[in-house]
Amino acid sequence: AIKKKKKSVPVTIENKSGFKGFFSNNLFIVLAFVIPFVLMTAAFGVMKVSPFGDNQILVTDLWHQYYPFLADMQEKLKHGESLFWSWTQGGGVNYFALMSYYLMSPLNFLTVFLPSEWLREFLMFSVVIKVACASMFMAIFLRSLFKKNDFSLVIFGCSFGFCAFFMGYYWNTIWLDTVCITPLVALGTVKLFTEGKFRLYIVSLALSLLTNYYIGLFACIFVLLSFIAYNIVKWDGIKKFATNILRTGIYSLIAIGLTAFFLLPAFFGLQNTNASGATFPTTFAINIGSTNDLMGVLEAIRKILSNFITFVPPAIKEADALPNIACGTLSLVLGILFFTSKKISLKEKIVDGCLIGFMIISCIIRQLDYIWHGFHFTNMIPYRFSYLISFVLVVMAFRAFMLLESSSCWDVILAALFVALVI
């Protein structure tokens, strides 16, 4: 008798009670936090960063702005001083507005329990924790979306946590909270679209805006792009589409409303600042290519694609740098397999390809770059939304990994060769 080939099914997530049960159910989620935590701590140890040596991570804006602001906040928390006004910056400053951009990481409030001389070490470990959280949240997203519970969650979680954006901009601690929350915003968005559940969406989006409203803007744009992509792939008539618009709009407004007590002071505070490059570009121009034409765009695309390679050193603070988008060779090869898999519909391939393509083009065309960054051009550190490209690629790679059994060895080899040829 000929035996029928068994279909591969996702690993069932058992729900066991008690502490041991919780640990057993979430073993790979825990590992997705612990392993990056250990690796980042070891890396700082090898680099002899304090407390492991005499070096420190206080560079550029972290040294000139974030560290002094955090030291001031620590003093205010310890001595019960006002969080609405400060006399330590210039002739006085609206401290509430300053906090809304620079100091709203939940970890910062833990400094009230620390001696002031430990602040540098605190900042180092806060980076470690945020990288570990990014990996863990990515693992949670992948497990919930694909119903798989094995060590692959750790691997792909780390692909996001150790992506070039984190490694290049680790010193920009005020951004990292919102970036590491991105998988939870995406998971909340998925649950809102597919199940009508709104709690995670509201809480995660509100936290993204609260921890840093500037990077939170990218989360809002990503929700919009996800909404468009989902409704194209899962089109179910105009009535369902209208319902989705209404539901997403209402819950998004609730999330924004929950943070209004911080966003409004920040908005009014921004009216008193000088913005960099606040004029919308009226003529076609590109950021990366050498000429403002089709050939320049193609040149820019080639350069950006080359930056997917893992061993390309990430940009740290160069204004003319390429976007930090590398997230591992595995993600890159599996990302190619995503487009060759027969198990994935053509519509899904086109939509996901267009999503990544749009974000890449947004790095090139100055008008799109201007819109992404809140109708401004950035002052150093370009393409601040580029972490979303890494996020989407890792998700696509995991989708292809789930269907790897349907791909032949030659498919994998050809995908790797294609990556080497194009990049």
PLM region descriptions:
Residues 27-62, 251-268, 357-361:
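Transmembrane signal-anchor helices characteristic of membrane glycosylation enzymes that use polyprenol
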